[in-house]
Each structure stands twice: as C-alpha cells, then as structure tokens.
Amino acid sequence: MREKYGERFARRVLTPLEWPGYLRTARPVLFLANRFAAKEAFSKAMGTGFRYPVTLQCISVVQERSGKPGFAFHPNLEKLVLSRGIVRHHLTISDEMSLACACVVLEAE
C-alpha cells in the first residue's frame, strides 16, 4: 500500500498527533489499518459514520499512560461528544496478521 499510494493515504487517515507513531513503526500498513478501524468504530458508535465533525482528521487514536488505547478529539468533535452526554469512551484494537478490528463503547450519563 505504501508503495502504491505513498504517504497520501496515511496523511488522510492520520492526525498530526498520530504521525510520529506511524514514522516509528516497523509495520506501517498495520498501524494505518488499526487507526482506521478505531476511527470507523467510533464513527459507528456515534451513529454518524464519517460526517463532520466525525472525520478521520478530527479523531486521534492515542495511548493512555496505562498503555490502553483511547481517543483525543478536535474541539468541534469534543463539543458534539459532550452535547450527547457522553462521559467516557472505551476502545479496544486487535490485529492478526493482515487484519485489524476495533470496538468502541460510549458511556453517557
């Protein structure tokens, strides 16, 4: 994929927060697949799909201090999340060989 599309696809999927991890990883295609799967799972949990402000560039997949994956949101998306009463989110990402999947649970008050 990297050879075919260069960095163009990576720049569409990844935010500036995620870019350093992509440059460091030994498995860039799997890194992208995991990030895309997580963002898609979030968009589906929100019930919007990828529609502004729920876009690839407004969602960053980050690693919490504990090592657990989580999200960081663009301010406009954060506003939408809070307006829906969502107080916590949970993310799990799994990969096996060339497959990636993610599950997102959103908790509201």
Q: Which residues make up each language-model segment?
A:
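Core catalytic alpha/beta fold that binds nucleotide/phospho-ligands
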Residues: 1-109
